[in-house]
Amino acid sequence: MPTFKLVLSDPLSGKARQFEIKDPLAQRFVGLRIGEEIDGTVLKELIELPKGVKIRITGGSGVEGAPMHPGVPGPVKRYILADGPPGYRPRKRGMRKKKLVRGDTITDSIVQINAVLVYPEGYSGPPAIPLGAKELEKLKGGKTEEAAASQ
């Protein structure tokens, strides 16, 4: 019985939302690999997505905190000599380090799945994950209007 936290990012609004996914919906994600796309209607119970939107898996992390790595095939844990992301950011140029990473396939031992919305070409509607009240206020310049009204 897998349970995942899905972090869904929206490129139109620049926002991300986190969802808790339990069985039987979680079973649809088991076996998917990094880079694969699934239809957005899978999440119709959690979020209302526009027609034609797909969800692309971009990564995740396991129970122990090891990130999924697109260069490691299969549902495995491996030590790699990492020289850059994902999983390691070197302090100096040329530094490498032995790091534990997970493979590129989602299994029951994955805790978090990172994904991004892929809109159809020519989409001009509103973003699926809207901006919050503070962001809208910043865009409209609400703070300057309040300051002018108080003087």
Swiss-Prot record:
GO terms for cellular component: ribonucleoprotein complex; ribosome. One of its GO terms (biological process) is translation. InterPro entries: Ribosomal_eS6, Ribosomal_eS6_arc, Ribosomal_eS6_CS. Keywords: Ribonucleoprotein, Ribosomal protein. The keyword Ribonucleoprotein applies. GO terms for molecular function: structural constituent of ribosome. Belongs to the eukaryotic ribosomal protein eS6 family. PANTHER family: 40S RIBOSOMAL PROTEIN S6. This is Small ribosomal subunit protein eS6. It comes from Pyrobaculum calidifontis (strain DSM 21063 / JCM 11548 / VA1). The gene is rps6e.
